[in-house]
């Protein structure tokens, strides 16, 4: 694209901004183009020309636990809703993270490195393709096509296989000799969107995923002594399970209490499935971004359900599937159920959108649509915080369809605030401050770029703080300033406009502004776009009789709430709070006044969620 086109585009965009809210955010040129094309709007809603592509997947695979060979076919009907003719279709082969020669940002043991996904046959619209029609580069595969016209559907049939990793468990792989979590297991078409065209980012292990909303039918064949749990609804439970187990599943789906679906005695008796040789498990999921499954021949299964939408009476089932030797997992069903309940009724106060949430005892700390792969933990507090964090991802990214690869903060930041808020609901003794201390330690260093830095450019500590605590705190501070009613109006407007679609960061910022009716650009720019640190201090303290006047200074550039804790000599405390609104005008000082109820011993500035790069100047001691 030549400079002249950029100039015209920028002039056109400046015209749009003249009628936009006071104070605008710095929008990159490639994102400005979405406003010109009418695919997105400056009030946050999708534009009149918004489009996204979709596909129907029919997956049939066999998995052999002994050899770890997964083999099968995938049939795809891909709908091109874009205005472009697609001369090629790009695929993702995520198992190629373990392929020889692939680029990786996470370590993989030599014994797990192999030949990757083997494509033995491919056809397009029932026309056989030879190998010259496709090219594989790491986790990407490009397939030449005759040209898929706008509004046209193209059909792919692919026969493939690969060996699942035994160790080096990066979100998928063998858990133990009789348990496996199997994700990203089929060739899938990459996202083609109005911003980047084809998503050609390689999956290297750190940055996560970006997938279209699709319809899935999956048939998964495993030995007869294994059970399967997966994204979506099991369509043939009555054909596979014994009548006893099938009855317990039905009971769990309609009862608030916990049902022991598979017990230790059931495992001993071996009467869980009807066919003891092999079973084909059939799952269906609609309008989801991915499908994952897990299998085991020795796991217990606890299940419960609850009404997640009081208007319709719709229920969702919650599962904990686990190794009996992992004692912490016996309580995970309670943590998971309470998380789904809290999400539906308190935060984000949106009915849990899927038919089930299954927490599987694995070797990672990872989310998938309707599934979680969580390692066991010794402390109940840690198990609670991990469980609610991963389940919260149901909303972000899965319900909302965000690009995790480029904008990790758009899902991990939400899972972080979700964890902070829900953990104390599950156990009021918990004050969950996950990752805040790490941010305070790195704030202002070379390892602390702005949140809006693309996640693809980050790794290590910079990736972690930009994805988790920094955006989580930003959301928390806005929630505190707006109050729950206005905050929910903004957040629900964003969810309503964009669930099932692909929002970019500016869609979120603009939706929050529009939905809440408050221009928050001053904070978005400071917290998400600018460099700087959070750093407050206690300045002058004036005392006239029992009247205290305290100067609080913002020595940094990031707006943080003011929480002054007054410690009295009898051990009691009083908290004085101001939201980030007190810094809105760019002032560097605010003044707090209070009347002491008793003799003051000391003043301490900063609560557990008030990030501060230097807490040494946050204490004033009475003389």
Question: Each predicted region: which residue ranges?
Answer:
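Solvent-exposed beta-hairpin/edge-strand motifs
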Residues: 86-129, 183, 221-226, 567-578
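Hydrophobic alpha-helical and helix-loop surface patches within well-folded domains
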Residues: 21, 27-42, 54-55, 283, ...
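Hydrophobic helix-coil surface modules that form long, contiguous segments used
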Residues: 193, 208-388, 417
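A surface-exposed beta-strand-loop module
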Residues: 28, 69, 79, 107-178, ...
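Short, hydrophobic/aromatic-enriched beta-strand segments in well-ordered soluble domains
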Residues: 74-76, 80, 91-93, 152-166, ...
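Glycine/proline-rich low-complexity spacer/linker segments in large multi-domain proteins
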Residues: 101-112, 161-216, 237, 306, ...
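Beta-strand-rich binding/interaction modules
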Residues: 229-230, 542-606
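Early extracytoplasmic/domain-onset interaction patches
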Residues: 25-90
């Amino acid at each position: 694209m030549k400079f002249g086109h950029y100039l015209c585009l920028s002039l056109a965009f400046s015209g749009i901004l003249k009628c936009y809210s006071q104070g605008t955010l710095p929008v990159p040129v490639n994102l400005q183009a979405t406003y010109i094309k009418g695919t997105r709007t400056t009030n946050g809603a999708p534009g009149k020309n918004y489009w996204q592509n979709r596909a129907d997947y029919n997956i049939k695979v066999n998995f052999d636990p002994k050899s770890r060979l997964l083999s099968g076919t995938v049939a795809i009907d891909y709908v091109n809703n874009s205005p472009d003719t697609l001369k090629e279709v790009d695929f993702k082969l995520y198992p190629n993270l373990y392929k020889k020669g692939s680029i990786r940002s996470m370590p993989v043991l030599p014994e797990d490195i192999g030949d990757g996904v083997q494509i033995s046959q491919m056809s397009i619209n029932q026309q056989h393709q030879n190998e010259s029609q496709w090219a594989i580069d790491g986790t990407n595969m490009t397939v030449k096509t005759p040209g898929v016209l706008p509004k046209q559907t193209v059909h792919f049939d692919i026969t493939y296989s690969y060996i699942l990793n035994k160790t080096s468990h990066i979100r998928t792989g063998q858990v133990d000799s009789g348990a496996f979590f199997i994700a990203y297991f089929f060739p899938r078409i990459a996202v083609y969107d109005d911003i980047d065209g084809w998503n050609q980012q390689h999956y290297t292990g750190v940055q996560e995923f970006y997938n279209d909303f699709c319809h899935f039918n999956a048939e998964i064949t495993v030995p007869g002594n294994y059970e399967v749990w997966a994204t979506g609804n099991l369509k043939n439970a009555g054909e596979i399970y014994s009548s006893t187990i099938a009855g317990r599943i039905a009971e769990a789906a309609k009862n608030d209490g916990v049902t022991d679906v598979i017990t230790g005695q059931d495992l001993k008796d071996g009467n869980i499935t009807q066919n003891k040789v092999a079973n084909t498990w059939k799952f269906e999921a609609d309008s989801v971004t991915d499908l994952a499954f897990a299998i085991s021949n020795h796991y217990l299964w606890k299940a419960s359900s609850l009404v997640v939408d009081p208007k319709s009476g719709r229920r969702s089932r919650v599962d904990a599937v686990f190794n009996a030797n992992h004692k912490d997992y016996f309580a995970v069903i309670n943590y998971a159920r309470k998380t789904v309940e809290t999400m539906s009724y308190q935060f984000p106060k949106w009915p849990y959108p899927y038919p089930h949430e299954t927490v599987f005892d694995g070797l990672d700390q990872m989310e998938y649509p309707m599934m979680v792969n969580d390692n066991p933990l010794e402390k109940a507090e840690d198990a609670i915080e991990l469980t609610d964090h991963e389940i919260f991802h149901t909303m972000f990214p899965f319900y909302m369809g965000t690009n995790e690869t480029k904008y990790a903060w758009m899902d991990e930041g939400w899972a972080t605030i979700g964890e902070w808020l829900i953990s104390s609901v599950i156990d009021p003794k918990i004050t969950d401050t996950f990752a805040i201390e790490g941010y305070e330690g790195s704030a202002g260093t070379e390892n602390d770029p702005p949140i809006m830095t693309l996640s693809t450019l980050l790794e290590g500590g910079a990736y972690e703080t930009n994805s988790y605590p920094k955006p989580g705190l930003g959301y928390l501070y806005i929630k505190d300033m707006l109050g729950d009613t206005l905050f929910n109006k903004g957040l629900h407007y964003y969810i309503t406009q964009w669930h099932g679609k692909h929002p970019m960061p500016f869609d979120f910022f603009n939706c929050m502004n529009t939905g809440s009716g408050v221009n928050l650009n001053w904070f978005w720019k400071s917290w998400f776009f600018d460099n700087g640190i959070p750093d407050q201090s206690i300045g002058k303290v004036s005392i006239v009789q029992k009247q205290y006047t305290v100067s609080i200074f913002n020595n940094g550039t990031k707006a943080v709430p003011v929480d002054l804790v007054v410690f009295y000599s009898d051990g009691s405390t009083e908290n004085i709070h101001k939201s980030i609104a007190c810094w809105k005008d760019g002032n560097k000082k605010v003044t707090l006044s209070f009347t002491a109820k008793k003799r003051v011993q000391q003043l301490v500035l900063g609560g557990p969620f008030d990030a501060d790069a230097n807490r040494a100047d946050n204490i004033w001691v009475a003389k």
